[in-house]
Amino acid sequence: LTKAADMTASALLRGARGNSGVILSLLFRGFSKSLKGKLEANGKDFAEALSAGVEAAYKAVMKPAEGTILTVSRLTGDAARDLAADDANLESVLMGSIETAKVALENTVNQNPVLKKAGVVDAGGMGFVTILEGMLASLQGNDVALQENAGETKEQADFTDFATEDITFAYDTVYIVRKKDETVNLEPLRVYLDSI
């Protein structure tokens, strides 16, 4: 279990694209750290690992925004903890967590003005839900089906309103800073980066 969690976190980091990809990799890095040394996990272990992942992701993001993968994962982690308190069965906790994640994902369009304007849900949140569904399928011994079309799509999102907005920054650059010493405070670096 430890090796699988580590490999997943590493693969997600190497394959990360954009903010959501990096956040997803950080979620699973925290998830992986929580499962370190475990040969198997129950629902409580899953809930604790998910909560650790959410905490790691929120800490890493300078300005967390609602209506994103962060919101979907946080609400899912909260639900997993509540579910695990009543029943430590991993399959039950995962199934209930997925239901919460789907509701949270559908609500992202109402929480984030950019998503609302485009009429879409958060792509990172959708990726997170898809990974949870893959975990459940694997746990149940089912093949993880690759879908050509994962659901209803808009023929064409209306991006005409975006063309008139002023763009402050033309590029988004993402860096991952790894600390050799966990006691090092990154806040001064964040303050400096936010000032430039």
Regions found by a protein language model. Give the residues of each.
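N-terminal loops that bind phosphate or other acidic moieties
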Residues: 1-196
